[in-house]
Amino acid sequence: MSYGDGEQPPVSETPEPKDDTNNPVFNLPPLLVGILAALLVAYVVPAYLLSEDGSNWFIFTFGFIPLRYAVPFSQQGLEWLWTPVSYSFLHGGIEHILFNGLWLMAFGAPVLRRIGTLRFVLLWCISAAVSAFGHAALNWGDVTVLIGAS
């Protein structure tokens, strides 16, 4: 194509590259930062701050135990209400919480951004409860404690 009479070819302007010097290394949604903090607190408190009896109480109170659903609710405390979700915040060791946290950052952040805060919280709670009750169905009446979402 020729350009006559002093016409110039169209010039495409390329945008200047953005200055990336102020971007954070981890750009995690606030809810995910809060969940990671809760996971850390739920690990540090029984592992390092409580006595052995206190740690056992913490795990028993917030861990999922299938036996709770084989015994009438009138014969026990209210732990059966929150343990289908609270167990997912507990971890058995530093490696357990470290790898779960890394996977949560890698895969949880895009899911959270895609589906939003409310749906993410519902996804967490429903999937934790379904997993817990699946465990209970396979281990009905068992006294072992289920901890961790992995």
How should each PLM-predicted stretch be described?
Residues 35, 41-147:
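N-terminal TM1-TM2 helical hairpin plus the immediately adjacent luminal interfacial "cap"
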